[in-house]
A protein has these predicted regions:
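Formylglycine-dependent sulfatase
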Residues: 1-249
């Protein structure tokens, strides 16, 4: 998340290259730049985390102002009670007329701690699971993947609600929507590994007014540290000199 926010690889970010650390204030983040340019910036759920920002000289989360008041009753035990989409609505309610905005919707789901058997209880069929070749193919693995899918669906529903909110206020066609992840699925040889399942994360971008030849599927190698300069270039804002990610406007 530090790399996404700063547009820099983790080996340049000192303490921020480690988990449960801090993000030194000297490293500029794209929400900070957008905020100075007049954007309303905010986040819900996971912004920059986990760690102690005060140790790096920061007083607030570099992802923006936190929106966290809206709660829900989770469908399953392991899910958090944050209503991410409703918090996004609260954020939109603070956007002034003609003010540009940037929001980070950071769900914790999918995350380990799945409720055992959640997949089967929602009617999913273990026999239809495509088991990656790096895992043993047995009932334990198949059902574990189904439980993972339940949390993926929870994420999907939150994104769908957020998109509908943009549509309601007439800003969907004028908004860059990026859906991605900070790491691979939380399974062996995936999250925290350099295997494909650990580094090959989803990335979908929608911007009808700005993307040429939309509807494409690309297999190009992309680094998520390139998102920060891409956002700033798309907004017509100068990219900080310390940023060494490359924009893909």
């Amino acid at each position: 998340r530090s790399a996404i926010l700063t547009g820099q690889p983790i080996w340049r970010l000192e303490e921020a290259g480690n988990l449960w650390s801090t993000l030194p204030k000297k490293f500029i983040t794209y929400p900070e730049v957008l905020n100075k340019a007049g954007y309303l910036v905010g986040f819900t759920g996971k912004g920059w985390s986990p760690g102690r920002l005060s140790a790096g000289g920061r007083e607030s989360n570099p992802a923006g102002k936190e929106f966290k008041d809206k709660k829900l009753k989770p469908s399953f035990k392991a899910m958090r009670n944050i209503d991410y989409a409703a918090n996004f609505d609260d954020f939109l309610g603070q956007v002034k007329k003609d003010q540009p905005f940037c929001f980070w919707l950071g769900t914790s789901e999918p995350h380990r701690g799945y409720e055992l058997g959640a997949g089967k209880r929602t009617g999913k069929d273990p026999s239809k699971v495509l088991v990656p070749g790096i895992f043993p193919d047995n009932s334990i693995v198949r059902n574990d993947i189904l439980d993972y899918y339940v949390e993926v669906e929870h994420f999907d529903k939150m994104v769908a609600r957020a998109i509908r909110s943009l549509e309601k206020i007439g800003q969907l066609e004028n908004t860059i929507v990026v859906v991605t992840s900070d790491h691979g699925m939380p399974f062996p040889r995936a999250k925290a590994s350099l295997y494909d399942a650990g580094t090959r994360v989803p990335l979908a971008i929608r911007w009808p007014q700005g993307i040429r030849k939309s509807g494409r599927v690309s297999h190009a190698l992309v680094n998520l540290s390139d998102l920060a300069p891409t956002f700033l270039e798309a907004a017509g804002i100068s990219v900080p000199k310390m940023t060494n990610g490359k924009g893909h406007k």
